[in-house]
Curated annotation (Swiss-Prot):
GO terms for biological process: defense response. GO terms for cellular component: extracellular region. It is found in: Secreted. This is Caerulein precursor fragment R2. The lineage of its organism: Eukaryota, Metazoa, Chordata, Craniata, Vertebrata. Keywords: Amphibian defense peptide, Antimicrobial, Secreted.
Length: 27
């Protein structure tokens, strides 16, 4: 449902934020 989608987006955002803060972007 919508909650599951939101959770996925949140997790992805946290991962991106951690990578950016760690100075190791995976792009």
């Amino acid at each position: 449902g919508f909650g599951s989608l939101l959770g996925k987006a949140l997790k992805a955002g946290l991962k991106l934020g951690a990578n950016l803060l760690g100075g190791a972007p995976q792009q």
